[in-house]
């Protein structure tokens, strides 16, 4: 009986500690600047998407329905992020970071690249319920990130599909130490896809080479 009581007391202490660490990230958003091609009539534009919560007008879709043409100057940039943290009375949110990576759709988890980190800056706070809410945002600092860096395009006939993956984390201090709160879609993270073209086909390269030879012959004749 004494042993059972000890176990119950220990369990209640654990439960109390868990309740005391209820602080969380309750909103997270990302800004993406898209220019599918510099030769089309559509200019580059930045859209902010909700990853979690309701900070922006649009939620991140499963697909951006976008094909970026790098041969025509197309680009895809991470250009900002926003977030909100809620902290219990004894806790204090120290930071908020957005983590991101890009990989070819279908790549096994073990083969995917490591995450990059995008630091959000503290902006302001309020306490409507007696507990502090903090707002975090970054645009000009740390600046933009080229999400296409190192990616290999597909061809015009067969574009390659890539997946963008995001999650957020915040370090929370409390009297007994610190812990990290995550916003990661229940462990699945937040994802969307896009397509990337073109890597010139062999036929295109051959045509380009023949055009160059013909131009060279014309110059020699002149």
Question: Can you name each region flagged by the protein language model?
Answer:
Residues 12-14, 92, 197, 208:
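A generic structural signal for short, solvent-exposed coil/turn residues
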Residues 1, 15, 186, 197, ...:
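Generic N-terminal leader/processing signal
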Residues 1-23, 204, 211, 222:
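Sec-dependent, cleavable N-terminal signal peptides
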Residues 20-196:
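Mature extracellular "passenger" or substrate-interacting domains of secreted, surface-exposed proteins
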Residues 199-217:
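A short, hydrophobic C-terminal helix/tail in secreted or cell-surface proteins
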């Amino acid at each position: 009986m004494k042993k059972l009581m000890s176990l119950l007391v220990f369990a209640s202490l654990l439960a109390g500690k868990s309740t005391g660490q209820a602080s969380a990230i309750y909103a997270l958003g990302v800004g993406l600047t898209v220019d599918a091609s510099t030769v089309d009539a559509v200019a580059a534009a930045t859209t902010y998407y909700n990853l979690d919560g309701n900070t922006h007008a649009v939620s991140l879709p499963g697909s951006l329905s976008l094909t970026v043409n790098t041969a025509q100057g197309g680009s895809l940039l991470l250009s900002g992020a926003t977030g909100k943290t809620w902290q219990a009375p004894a806790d204090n949110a120290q930071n908020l970071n957005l983590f991101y990576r890009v990989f070819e759709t279908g790549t096994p988890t073990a083969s995917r690249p490591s995450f990059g980190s995008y630091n959000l800056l503290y902006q302001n706070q309020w306490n409507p319920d007696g507990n502090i809410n903090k707002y975090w945002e970054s645009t000009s600092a740390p600046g933009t990130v080229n999400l296409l860096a190192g990616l290999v395009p597909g061809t015009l006939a067969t574009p390659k599909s890539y997946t963008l993956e995001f999650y957020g984390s915040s370090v929370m201090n409390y009297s007994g130490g610190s812990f990290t709160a995550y916003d990661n879609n229940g462990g699945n993270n937040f994802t969307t896809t896009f397509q990337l073209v073109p890597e010139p086909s062999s036929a295109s390269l051959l045509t380009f080479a023949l055009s160059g030879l013909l131009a060279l012959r014309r110059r020699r004749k002149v």
